[in-house]
């Protein structure tokens, strides 16, 4: 299987003690369906978590430490970002997109689009964040060496969402259906940059590259599967090929109902997928068991905020029943706004009893 030999090689190259390599070994065994001794853990938290539940998150980290971590975005020059993306107010990201946030703990919406004309060809309006290509490789590699866990790249690749941030969601979706060819200059400029960014991260000691795009509503894709395959699948294929070229794994996140494109993600070589598996239905996802690793989750809309102990336990058992096959599941769980902290503990307690 892809990555098995690289796993052993990288453990030796990073020269960690046996105790420091256990987390990485677990994740690779899970990705390769090699029957790990337990399920790898990954908690997703935000600043809100530490402000509202400091003792709970501290205890959780002590009792159920992560096996997967994000590498900080070590850059040699300033990113150009201004403000806090999760705080109330205005935030300017690395592309110069201005976000207005009215609620603490979640990223806001783009306030003003950069591509305001009817001509997508005017790509000079798109200023790519070149600072994101000038990685501090020494700092990244040192982080990977000291971390002990499976390390994900701090990459910012989100081709569909970035086009929306630059042009606005309404214009993006309308033109995808009415005149998709006109969008190609902008899409290709952003895509070329993202390929360069992934290649930069792939030449560090991180274990996996990371890409993300929210493709679904709660009941369907935002665009037709056919249109997705025509325009975006080739781009994701190239991202996955970069990972293979540099012998890295590749992880992807996408919210919403994306069942229709999961076979495509498997085909192009996505190793692990974080998605809203409960809105798609575990029974429907069972057909993909053993073909891709389900990187979480547990229902963060109903079960984590409102469920009782038995409901949380049953949710975890259902994931194990339908999606586990000698691996292929990561115990990922959100500890964000509105989540009951006791339910997060119950998630990992239950996984610990099952695997």
Question: Where do the model's predicted regions map?
Answer:
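Active-site loop segments of alpha/beta catalytic cores
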Residues: 2-51, 56, 92, 101, ...
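Segments that shape or occlude catalytic/ligand-binding pockets
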Residues: 49-84
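An N-terminal domain-start capping segment
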Residues: 64-72, 111-126, 155-166
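A contiguous, low-structure linker/loop signature
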Residues: 81-129, 146-150
């Amino acid at each position: 299987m892809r990555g098995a030999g690289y796993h052993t090689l990288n453990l030796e190259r990073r020269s960690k003690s046996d105790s420091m390599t256990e987390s990485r070994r677990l994740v690779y065994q899970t990705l390769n369906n090699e029957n790990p001794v337990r399920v790898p853990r990954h908690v997703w938290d935000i600043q809100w978590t530490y402000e509202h539940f400091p003792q709970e998150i501290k205890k959780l980290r002590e009792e159920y430490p992560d096996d997967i971590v994000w590498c900080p975005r070590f850059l040699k020059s300033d990113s150009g970002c201004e403000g806090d993306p999760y705080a109330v107010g205005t935030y300017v990201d690395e592309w110069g997109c201005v976000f207005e946030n009215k609620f603490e703990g979640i990223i806001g919406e783009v306030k003003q689009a950069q591509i305001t004309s009817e001509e997508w060809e005017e790509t000079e309006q798109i200023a790519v964040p070149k600072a994101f290509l000038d990685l501090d490789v020494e700092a990244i590699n040192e982080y990977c060496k000291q971390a002990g866990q499976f390390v994900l790249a701090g990459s910012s690749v989100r081709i569909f969402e970035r086009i929306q941030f630059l042009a606005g969601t309404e214009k993006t979706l309308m033109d995808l259906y009415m005149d998709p060819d006109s969008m190609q200059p902008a899409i290709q400029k952003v895509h070329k940059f993202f390929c360069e960014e992934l290649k930069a991260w792939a030449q560090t000691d991180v274990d996996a590259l990371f890409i993300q795009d929210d493709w679904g509503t709660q009941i369907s894709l935002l665009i037709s599967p056919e249109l997705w395959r025509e325009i975006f699948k080739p781009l994701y294929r190239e991202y996955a090929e970069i990972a293979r070229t540099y012998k890295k794994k590749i992880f992807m996140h996408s919210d919403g109902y994306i069942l229709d494109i999961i076979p495509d993600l498997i085909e192009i070589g996505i190793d692990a997928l974080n998605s809203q598996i409960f809105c798609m239905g575990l029974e429907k996802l069972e057909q993909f068991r053993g073909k891709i690793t389900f990187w979480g989750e547990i229902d963060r809309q109903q079960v984590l905020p409102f469920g009782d102990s038995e409901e949380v336990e049953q949710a975890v058992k259902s994931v194990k029943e339908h999606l586990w096959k000698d691996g292929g599941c990561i115990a990922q769980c959100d500890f964000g706004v509105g989540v009951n902290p006791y339910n997060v503990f119950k998630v990992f307690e239950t996984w610990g009893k099952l695997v």
